[in-house]
C-alpha cells in the first residue's frame, strides 16, 4: 500500500503513524509532574510544620503567628527553588535545541526527561531517608542541567509543528496542551489521596513520589524506544496553496506564513514595497506579549499554593489536589475555545480573548473568601491557555522548520527567565501583603494580563485581510 493518501483538496498527505505521536510522552511526563508538584508542596509543608512546632514548643504562639511563620518559610523555600529551576537550564537548553535542529529532534526531549526522572528520584529519596528539604535544591539543579522544562517543551512544540500544516498548527499545538492538561488533571486529583496512603512522619508521601518516578521512567523509555520524528509537511510548490481548513469547522485559520504570501504573489498578485514579508517587529511584539502575559500567569500560579493553605481557605491535602486539578481544566476549555473561535477569528483575536479571560479571573481571585468563590474565579479563566500556545503557533508560521528548535528554546528560556524574576517578586510581595490584603498579587496579575493586550493589538492592527480566504499581510 502506498505510504501516502490522496486528498482531493490538498494532494498527497502523509499517512498517520502512531509512533510519531508525542502525546504519550507528554501525558506520562505530566502525570509525573503533577504528582511531583503536589508532593513537593505537601512534603515541604510537613517539613516546616514539624520544624516550626519543635522550635516553638517552649514558648507557645498563637495559631496565626505559627501559620504566618510557616507560610514565610514555604515561600522562602520556593523563592530559592524557583530560582534554581529557572536559571539552571540556561547552561544546557539552548545547546540541546541546537543539537536537536542539527542532528536529531529527540535529543532535547530525551535529555530533559532524564533530568525529570533524576529530580523525581531526589524527592523520593528525601521522603524515604528523611533528608532535609535543602536536598531538593540539588535535585532541581540536576533537572535544569539536563535542559529542564524549557528544553522538553520546546522539543515537543518542534515535533508538533514539524508534522502539521500552518492551517492545522494552532489546533495541533493546543491538542498537545489538552493532553498535558488531562494528564495533569488526573494526577492532581489522585495526588492528595496518594499522599495520605502512608501516614506517619517517615512514610508520608512515599507512594505519591514512587508513582511520580514510575511515570517519569515510562516517559523516558517511550521517548527512547518508541517515539519517531514525524516528516515535515511540505508546501505545494507550483500551484496556489489550498486553504487549510480544520476538519469539522466552517471557517479557516488566518495564517501568518510568509511563504504562502510569496506563492500568491508569484501567480499574479505582486507585493507592494514593504509588504512581501512580515517585519521582525511582528515577532518582537509577539515575544513581548507572551512575556508580559507569562509574568501574570507565573505569578498567580506561584502564589495560589500558599494562598489556599492559609486562612480563610486553609485546605487539607485532598483539597489541595482538587484545587490543582481545577487549574488543569483550563487546558480542556482552552482547546474547545480554539476549535470554536478559529471558525471566525484570527490568531491575534484569540490571544486577546484568552488574556481577558485570565485577567478577569485573577481579579476575582483577589477577593476570594470561600472555597466556592475560588472555583468560580478559576472557571472565569477558562481560556487562559490560548494566548501563549497561539503565540507559539503564529511564530512557527514566520520561521523556517529547521529553526523551530532554536526559536522555541529562545522563547521558552525567555519565559523561564521572566518566571524566575516573577517568582521571587511575587513571593516577596505576598509575604509583605498577606496580613493587609492577601489578594494583592492576583490584582497585580490582572493588571499585567490586560497590559499584555497592547502589543498583541498592535500586531492585529498591522494585519489586513488580503483575500476572502483569510490570508493576512502587514500594513
UniProtKB/Swiss-Prot annotation:
SUPFAM superfamilies tied to this protein: MFS general substrate transporter
Protein name: Solute carrier family 46 member 2
TM regions (residue ranges): 24-44, 79-99, 109-129, 139-159, 173-193, 206-226, 283-303, 321-341, 348-368, 371-391, 407-427, 436-456
Task performed by this protein: Proton-coupled transporter that delivers pathogen-associated or danger-associated molecular patterns to cytosolic pattern recognition receptors as part of the innate immune response to microbes or tissue injury. Has selectivity toward muropeptides that contain the amino acid diaminopimelic acid (DAP-type peptidoglycan muropeptides) including Tri-DAP and tracheal toxin (TCT), common in Gram-negative bacteria and Gram-positive bacilli.
Side Extracellular, residues: 45-78, 130-138, 194-205, 304-320, 369-370, 428-435
Tissue: Strongly expressed in the adult thymus. Expressed in spleen, lymph nodes, thymus, PBL, bone marrow and fetal liver. Expressed in monocytes and pre-dendridic cells.
GO cellular component terms attached to this protein's record: cell surface; endosome membrane; membrane; plasma membrane
Any single Pfam family the record assigns to this protein: MFS_1
Source species: Homo sapiens
Amino acid at each position: 500500500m502506498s505510504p501516502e493518501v490522496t486528498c482531493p483538496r490538498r494532494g498527497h498527505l502523509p499517512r498517520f503513524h502512531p509512533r510519531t505521536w508525542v502525546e504519550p510522552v507528554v501525558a506520562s511526563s505530566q502525570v509525573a509532574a503533577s504528582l511531583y508538584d503536589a508532593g513537593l508542596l505537601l512534603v515541604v509543608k510537613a517539613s516546616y510544620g514539624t520544624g516550626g512546632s519543635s522550635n516553638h514548643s517552649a514558648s507557645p504562639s498563637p495559631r496565626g503567628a505559627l501559620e504566618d511563620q510557616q507560610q514565610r518559610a514555604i515561600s522562602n523555600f520556593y523563592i530559592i527553588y524557583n530560582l534554581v529551576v529557572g536559571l539552571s537550564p540556561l547552561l544546557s537548553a539552548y545547546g540541546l535545541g541546537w543539537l536537536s535542529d542539527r542532528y536529531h529532534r529527540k535529543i532535547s526531549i530525551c535529555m530533559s526527561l532524564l533530568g525529570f526522572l533524576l529530580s523525581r528520584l531526589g524527592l523520593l529519596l528525601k521522603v524515604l531517608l528523611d533528608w532535609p528539604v535543602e536536598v531538593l535544591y540539588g535535585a532541581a539543579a540536576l533537572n535544569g542541567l539536563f535542559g529542564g522544562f524549557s528544553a522538553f517543551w520546546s522539543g515537543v512544540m518542534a515535533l508538533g509543528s514539524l508534522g502539521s500544516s500552518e492551517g492545522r498548527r494552532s489546533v495541533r499545538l493546543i491538542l498537545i496542551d489538552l493532553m498535558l492538561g488531562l494528564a495533569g488533571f488526573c494526577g492532581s486529583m489522585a495526588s492528595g489521596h496518594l499522599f495520605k496512603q502512608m501516614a506517619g512522619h517517615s512514610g508520608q508521601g512515599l507512594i505519591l513520589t514512587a508513582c511520580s518516578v514510575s511515570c517519569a521512567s515510562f516517559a523516558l523509555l517511550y521517548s527512547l524506544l518508541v517515539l519517531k520524528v514525524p516528516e515535515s509537511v511540505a508546501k505545494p510548490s507550483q500551484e496556489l496553496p489550498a486553504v487549510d481548513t480544520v476538519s469539522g469547522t466552517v471557517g479557516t485559520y488566518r495564517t501568518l506564513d510568509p511563504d504562502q504570501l510569496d506563492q500568491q504573489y508569484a501567480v499574479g498578485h505582486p507585493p507592494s514595497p514593504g509588504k512581501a514579508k512580515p517585519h521582525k517587529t511582528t515577532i518582537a511584539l509577539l515575544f513581548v506579549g507572551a512575556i508580559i502575559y507569562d509574568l501574570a500567569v507565573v505569578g498567580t500560579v506561584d502564589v495560589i499554593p500558599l494562598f489556599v493553605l492559609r486562612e480563610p481557605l486553609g485546605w487539607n491535602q485532598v483539597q489541595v489536589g482538587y484545587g490543582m486539578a481545577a487549574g488543569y481544566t483550563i487546558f480542556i476549555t482552552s482547546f474547545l475555545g480554539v476549535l470554536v473561535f478559529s471558525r471566525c477569528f484570527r490568531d491575534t483575536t484569540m490571544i486577546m480573548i484568552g488574556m481577558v479571560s485570565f485577567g478577569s479571573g485573577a481579579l476575582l481571585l483577589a477577593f476570594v473568601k470561600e472555597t466556592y468563590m475560588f472555583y468560580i474565579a478559576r472557571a472565569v479563566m477558562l481560556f487562559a491557555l490560548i494566548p501563549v500556545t497561539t503565540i507559539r503557533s503564529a511564530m512557527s508560521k514566520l520561521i523556517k522548520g529547521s529553526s523551530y528548535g532554536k526559536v522555541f528554546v529562545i522563547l521558552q528560556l525567555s519565559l523561564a527567565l521572566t518566571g524566575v524574576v516573577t517568582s521571587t517578586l511575587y513571593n516577596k510581595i505576598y509575604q509583605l501583603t498577606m496580613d493587609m490584603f492577601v489578594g494583592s498579587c492576583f490584582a497585580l496579575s490582572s493588571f499585567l494580563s490586560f497590559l499584555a493586550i497592547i502589543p498583541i493589538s498592535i500586531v492585529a492592527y498591522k494585519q489586513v485581510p488580503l483575500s476572502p480566504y483569510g490570508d493576512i499581510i502587514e500594513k
